[in-house]
């Protein structure tokens, strides 16, 4: 296979993966729990902001409960995602900005997170097998989350 063909294939795969990420954004905005869960494998290792330390796959009831704590849409917008693909494995990392208003809250929520996704092509579709989301915290002894940081 020529270098040009391989580069075209890699570019196509990156577009497919970015479409998965965009679909996640739309699903959360629309609070559609089934679309939120769709790109994840049943055994995906998910290290997100909420306890416990690791989730395995998406728990539909738990995710719906979380979606229902928001008044209006939830905006989780990707930025500066870098995608690397090798065969049927891909990983990407970048930032996610989260904006929304929790029910009963006086102020909207708005902060940046770091995001890493590992995907595997299964039966022709890219599926998330690993997700790690984090917010840095200040190392000054306060353990405050660094919600003021921006990319």
Stretches with model-predicted labels:
Residues 40, 46, 139, 145-146:
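Outer-membrane beta-barrel domain signature
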Residues 1-8, 24, 28:
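Juxtamembrane and targeting peptides
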Residues 29, 98-104, 119, 136:
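Beta-strand elements of well-folded, non-transmembrane domains
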Residues 112-142:
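Short beta-strand edge/turn micro-motifs at domain boundaries
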Residues 149-151:
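Extended, polar beta-sheet/loop recognition surfaces of beta-rich domains
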